[in-house]
A protein has these predicted regions:
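Active-site-proximal alpha-helix that buttresses catalytic centers in soluble enzyme cores
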Residues: 1-134
Length: 134
């Protein structure tokens, strides 16, 4: 189940699902949880959740199902992946197709992976330049 940031009865229709790979080490997810909290704080009108491809819970399908049960009709999936490998080229489209069939009343869209966002790449590059400056 999604660890709802907003646990009261849903009066919102839109949700954002941050989608990460997952890992065996529970601490691995902390940066993603921090991002979820930051977005939820800045966008209180939006339900913000975190879901995983594997190794951690909730799975994307379980998270979307819970959001639909809670009355969300617009769900945006944001892949928190730096590069498009097999998971984004094969696994995510397959998952999204299945979710769109199972939850036809909800509009499910997907954003570009964060690794394709110019502002993020520029921020990483800037941090690396500053970190190695003498």
């Amino acid at each position: 189940m999604c660890a709802a940031v907003n646990s009261t009865l849903n009066t919102k229709h839109s949700a954002l699902v941050l989608f990460a790979h997952g890992a065996r080490d529970a601490q691995w997810s902390e940066p993603f949880r921090a991002i979820r909290e930051a977005v939820a704080t800045r966008r209180p009108e939006l339900t913000v959740e975190l879901a995983f491809l594997e190794l951690m819970q909730p799975a994307l399908g379980d998270c979307v199902a819970q959001l639909v049960r809670d009355g969300h009709t617009r769900i945006t999936v944001a892949p928190l992946f730096l590069a498009q490998g097999g998971h984004l080229k094969k696994d995510l489209p397959r998952l999204l197709k299945d979710l769109s069939v199972r939850h036809a009343a909800a509009k499910i869209t997907v954003l570009a992976p964060i690794g394709e966002v110019t502002e993020l790449l520029n921020a990483i590059s800037e941090w690396l330049v500053k970190s190695t400056a003498r």
